[in-house]
Amino acid sequence: MPKFKQRRRKLKAKAERLFKKKEASHFQSKLITPPPPPPSPERVGISSIDISQSRSWLTSSWNFNFPNIRDAIKLWTNRVWSIYSWCQNCITQSLEVLKDTIFPSRICHRELYSVKQQFCILESKLCKLQEALKTISESSSCPSCGQTCHMSGKLTNVPACVLITPGDSKAVLPPTLPQPASHFPPPPPPPPLPPPPPPLAPVLLRKPSLAKALQAGPLKKDGPMQITVKDLLTVKLKKTQSLDEKRKLIPSPKARNPLVTVSDLQHVTLKPNSKVLSTRVTNVLITPGKSQMDLRKLLRKVDVERSPGGTPLTNKENMETGTGLTPVMTQALRRKFQLAHPRSPTPTLPLSTSSFDEQN
């Protein structure tokens, strides 16, 4: 907002200056010398110079400009354009804020983009520093002489805080500002880099003499943890059981004793039922799906007048409701017949030889 107000003030001041200039020019154009008096009627001949002067005066009077209207139009257009740009900026800012509130990932994307840009800048700077270090190492490898190296003139603006790589850890950087040769002598070149260490040979355990020779050698602590011959020789092994011993301890399934033998089965004695139900009770009261149990324990003797068949007599009169067998009676008779004549008689209970009529 302050930038926008400052810009609007500048535009207003510029428009006022232009307006004042136009007014001054218009006022000066009005102060023109008056035209010469018209010729007298006595003169008959008119010179060409007078005609041209009169025509020029007429053209100058007809060339009338409207600077005020143009300046006003420009001023209003500038104001409208500034208001339009201000509204557009406000709308875009509000939309950006709304988008950031609805989608918070946009902020993360912007931050990530800025971090990427910074990373690219740092990477480019690092590449430049690595190139500078390479050139310094090349210049240090030249033989030392009384004069400075020919490459030192190209590296006067090397920064002091340089990220040193592992390979160039011992390289000494020159100072940032070149020293004048009159006050101090040129600095000596840095010492050459040490040669890289040779690769380690693989450890081979073929003979005890080689193992002892390797055991006496020094160990490097800089690298990762290594298993030496001494560690292998000091390892103690525990005695384990072989497969044959384990098989002897675990008996085979054939050698196991059987859980139930024939003699055990022969010594088993079955107890007979103390109270065997009569054929009439088993044939009539017990259904094939139920277990055979003595129902006389659950019954209680009651003094009730009974019919010869055993059913209790009631006060209701036995009235015949119809002739013939009903479906319920046929089902009851069929069930009674099946109970009296089972298909697979049990060996414990004797077969009933009495007929269906005798049982009734």
From Swiss-Prot:
GO terms for cellular component: cytoplasm; membrane; nucleus. A motif (Phosphodegron) lies at residues 285-291, 325-330. A motif (KEN box) lies at residues 316-318. GO terms for biological process: regulation of cell cycle. The keyword Ligase does not apply. Induction: Expression increases from G1 to G2/M phase. It comes from the Eukaryota. The keyword Nucleus applies. Residues 349-360 have a biased composition (Low complexity). Ubiquitinated. Rapidly degraded by the proteasome; degradation may involve FBXW7-specific phosphorylated phosphodegron motifs. Residues 175-201 have a biased composition (Pro residues). A motif (D-box) lies at residues 296-304. It is found in: Cytoplasm; Nucleus. Residues 20-43, 174-201, 340-360 are annotated as: Disordered. Ubiquitously expressed. Keywords: Cytoplasm, Nucleus, Phosphoprotein, Ubl conjugation. The modification Phosphoserine is found at residues 40, 291, 344. The modification Phosphothreonine is found at residues 33, 287, 346, 348. Plays a critical role in cell cycle progression. This is Proline-rich protein 11. It comes from Homo sapiens. The lineage of its organism: Eukaryota, Metazoa, Chordata, Craniata, Vertebrata.
